[in-house]
Amino acid sequence: MDTERGSISSSEISRTAHLQDRTVACLPPSYGQLVTILSIDGGGIRGIIPGTILAYLESQLQELDGEEARLVDYFDVISGTSTGGLIVAMLTAQDQSGGHSRNSNRPLFEAKEIVPFYLKHSPKIFPQPRGIFCGWGETIVRLVGGPKFNGKYLHDLVEGFLGDTKLTQSLTNVVIPCFDIKKLQPVIFSSYQAVNNQAMNAKLSDICISTSAAPTFFPAHRFTNEDSEGIKHEFNLIDGGIAANNPTLCAIAEVTKQIIKKNPVMGDISPLDFTRFLVISIGTGSIRNQEKYNAKMASKWGLMCWVFESGSTPILDCYSEAIHDMVDYQSSVVFQALRSEKNYLRIDDDSLKGDLGSVDISTEKNMEGLVEVGEALLKKRVSRVNLESGHYQPISENVTNEEALKRFAKVLSEERKLRESRSPKLKI
């Protein structure tokens, strides 16, 4: 046990007894030096981009720690919005099939299976319009005929592989934002909250369907969940991207709340000690450099044009980009102000153009293009938000995202080994 940090008392361990009821893959921060966070943006079919990045990160961890290594073994919190929420569930829901003889706490999917999953199922989740439903026909249907997609295939798919798995049954702590359209307020589904509030311990399938229910694209999702006293709580939810398309700050906030509450699993980490935070935030690409709209165009728009214009949804594009950018800007400010910028890695591409910038074009050509975007992004230099201009610019060091992920993988591997060496359960 590290004498500088001190040992973990038996009383602290007993106070975290609720964790022993959960099958978790990652030992808590109290056994290590860091709190580790992975965040995945929303973006529909563009989830292929983070899928490519995550596959690379997991492959680096497997090179260090063996082929059984999974992302869930290294992160205290994995957060995701919309398509990011679906990826979170894939990476953290436990595989109940018993296919892993050496280790029972394995997730349903490896990171390398995310992209094939999207390539296989996206054409049915986002069926492309044909015949009279193309062009103006599609426009009229979208304006007066309900959401673009009925969501049935997505619902059946998610319910099929997640079953009745509850939020607290995830293999690490999960944070997934949604938005309650009845109460007009965000709902953050967090494993930390769900442990003590049964009403928030919803099925992962309901949470994934809800956070993916993008207005105009998929129907809103209603479900109920009982609290510990048997009282039913109603949820009327839509896409979490309305509140936090980039859920990085949501995840940091959930961790910070646990630190403030002195949850013993957090050890002696201080809320403002960002040298002890390690955050990887992965985007789904941005159309900001495409400059699709301008003031001359928008000055002539009425309600309908703001909702639907030339195959796009300007009002949603504006909200999504604004929320996405502000979170990254604020995160960058905090880490740079506290001299911890090397602990924060944001990977995103702000140069998407044409169909690549859509959230629902599921043609083979477009999906292959998104895979190429993800692969090219690995080769690009690490960029950070310039605090004066607000734009991304490469950092001074000539480091690619691929190289940065290798460095983070090494830090994550060392942190995991440190926790295992300090854990009484794992000592021989």
Curated annotation (Swiss-Prot):
GO cellular component terms listed in the entry, alphabetical order: cytoplasm
Active-site annotation: S82 (nucleophile), D239 (proton acceptor)
Pfam family, one: Patatin
Keywords: Cytoplasm, Hydrolase, Lipid degradation, Lipid metabolism, Phosphoprotein, Plant defense
The protein's name in its UniProt record: Patatin-like protein 3
Gene Ontology terms describing biological process: defense response; lipid catabolic process; response to abscisic acid
Organism listed in the record: Arabidopsis thaliana
GO terms assigned for molecular function: monoacylglycerol lipase activity; phospholipase activity
Induction notes from the record: By abscisic acid (ABA) or phosphate deficiency in roots.
UniProt domain comment: The nitrogen atoms of the two glycine residues in the GGXR motif define the oxyanion hole, and stabilize the oxyanion that forms during the nucleophilic attack by the catalytic serine during substrate cleavage.
Keyword set includes Phosphoprotein: yes
Family, as annotated: Belongs to the patatin family.
Free-text function comment from the UniProt entry: Possesses non-specific lipolytic acyl hydrolase (LAH) activity. Catalyzes the hydrolysis of the neutral lipids monogalactosyldiacylglycerol (MGDG), digalactosyldiacylglycerol (DGDG) and phosphatidylglycerol (PG), and less efficiently the polar lipids phosphatidylcholine (PC) and phosphatidylinositol (PI), but not the storage lipid triacylglycerol (TAG). May play a role in root development.
Disruption-associated phenotype: No visible phenotype under normal growth conditions, but mutant plants exhibit an impaired response to phosphate deficiency during root development.
Superkingdom, natural source: Eukaryota
Domain PNPLA: from-to ranges: 38-252
Enzyme class: hydrolase
Motif extent (DGA/G): 239-241
GN (gene name): PLP3
EC number: 3.1.1.-
